[in-house]
Amino acid sequence: MFGFFFSSGQEKYSVKNILKDSGYALDSFYVGATFTYSALNKNSKIEKLFLSEFNYLTPENASKQSRIHPRPGVWDWDRHNDWIEFANKNNLTVRIHGPISPQASKWAKNDNRTQEELMLNMEEYFTELCLRINNEPSVKWMDVVNETVLRNGEWFSDKPGDSSWENPWTQIGLNSDGFPIYIIKAFEIAQKYAPNVKLVYNHNGGMERKMWEKVLETIKYLKNKGLRVDGLGWQAHLRDKNGAGLVKKDLDYLSYLIDWCHLNEMGFHVTELNYWLRDEDPNSINVLKRQSISYSNIINTLIAKRGSGLVTLNHWGLKSKKGPGSYPKNILSIYDNDLRATQAFYSIKKSLIEKNTIIRLPK
């Protein structure tokens, strides 16, 4: 089948054409990708690859607080505006990735910040973001919060210093019911100032039960307060060997999460799919096979749920690359370093064409 794609022409068997020609509901089943700002509007091979394959885009980090409003009096909309212009020009559907999240500025992470300073900065930034995207024709979804809960089910909070992965917004405090004020405030702002945009509660991790129970409890709490939560996102940074895409009980729990969303009139979004390695050889046959199986299992799970509600999948980066440190040391995606499509990408296309719903585990 892989050779079939090679010999039959990439354009005919692009993801967007497979979805259209195979009868998928194009208003409730989306497959897209993210690529780096450095490749945008430069007639680059990466940009051309994206446009040839996809019509669903998540701009990488251009809409986050750390970029747009990192400290009082400082605003920078240039990258955000460039992505919006690109999306509108090419008739793309966009999910804005600018959540209130740990990806915050050093100013926000500074240990001397007060609750009042953090709340003011958050309100200024998020209100303006919502106002700007509300009437953009390309923008369909936005991430409102991200990475709110640790794997053990506790709220993700601040750490000493300003260089760690931490969530400074939790310092604003908990309300009388024990929920972070920033989460509630973020959804209040989004509901008020972005009524035309679907609101997503994005999250990371694997399929840790305590973590997801806390997230679902929070969503129910928000809804009971009359706030709109239109979708749940899972980043899906998959691990090699024992990642969620390779473990039956985790895939079953993923299926449960999607069912829960659809029963609660919410969409389910796989928001940042890629494959993380520690010391494994990124070019080894076994690693590439496990990545392919993982990706097949994720997309097959989404295909199986397409009749009950909205599902989307976004690849976080088109090109495989080195990681930021010892873990992940390497990050695999759907094209290799030479921009050749990977086995995992062809597995996704094969599943989409066949409408495959079978879960396959490594031997």
Functional labels for PLM-detected ranges:
Residues K16-D21, H69, R132, D143, ...:
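Aromatic-rich peripheral "rim/lid" segments of glycoside hydrolase catalytic domains that contact
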Residues S52-P70, R79-V200, N204-G206, M266, ...:
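Substrate-binding cleft and catalytic face of glycoside hydrolase catalytic domains
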